[in-house]
């Protein structure tokens, strides 16, 4: 060997994460990461890599009046612990407006070729429950429609810019208000 050892992978402790979540995150993100307030995201069942990315972004570069002050005091280990905890929690199902969800499903699965909107399923999986953990693309199924709508509007207006290579900003810039509402409802109704 050349005398260099590979760094051990950093792993979170779900039990420590639960204690931290119950003390700091519970008020907004709800029991087990299932927010009861539709403008705050559900964290239950989310990829740990995505949660780590978001918390580190809040600590380092993503200004948000609610989350930045909450994330700043977290140690790197606490971030890993929270991510490990939330990843193991079951998410509560959502219900969708059937008419909007039907329109949203088409957009999610196939995009809108006329306006250049790519299919959401290409990155977030065929049913919104997979995402791609290594790429840090989130799971979207059962997420609150209000939160998803707000997030897409923030990407569209470049109020949120922590997406790799501007991928979400580029896709959201082509979405109409009606398309945002429809895909948000569709995702809220997915149970995977």
Swiss-Prot record:
InterPro entries, alphabetized: Cyt_c-like_dom, Cyt_c-like_dom_sf, Cyt_C_IC, Cytochrome_c4-like, Cytochrome_c_Oxidase_Subunit
Residue ranges constituting the Cytochrome c domain according to the UniProt record: 12-90, 99-191
Chain positions recorded as heme c 2 binding sites: 120, 123-124
Coiled coil region boundaries: none
Heme as UniProt keyword: yes
Binding residues for heme c 1: 25, 28-29
Task performed by this protein: Diheme, high potential cytochrome c believed to be an intermediate electron donor in an anaerobic electron transport chain.
Protein name (database record): Cytochrome c4
């Amino acid at each position: 060997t050349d005398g260099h050892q590979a760094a051990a992978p950093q792993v979170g402790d779900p039990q420590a994460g639960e204690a931290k979540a119950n003390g700091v995150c519970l008020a907004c993100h709800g029991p087990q990461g299932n927010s009861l307030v539709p403008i705050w995201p559900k964290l239950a069942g989310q990829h740990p890599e995505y949660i780590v990315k978001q918390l580190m972004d809040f600590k380092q570069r993503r200004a948000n009046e609610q989350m930045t002050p909450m994330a700043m005091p977290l140690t790197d280990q606490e971030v890993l612990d929270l991510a490990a905890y939330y990843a193991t929690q079951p998410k509560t199902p959502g219900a969708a407006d059937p008419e909007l969800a039907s329109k949203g499903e088409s957009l999610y699965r196939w995009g809108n070729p006329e306006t250049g909107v790519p299919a959401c399923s290409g990155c977030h999986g065929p049913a919104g429950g997979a995402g791609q953990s290594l790429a840090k693309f989130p799971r979207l199924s059962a997420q609150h429609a209000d939160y998803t709508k707000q997030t897409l509007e923030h990407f569209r207006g470049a109020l949120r810019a922590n997406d790799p290579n501007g991928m979400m900003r580029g896709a959201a810039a082509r979405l109409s208000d009606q398309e945002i509402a429809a895909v948000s409802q569709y995702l809220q109704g997915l149970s995977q």
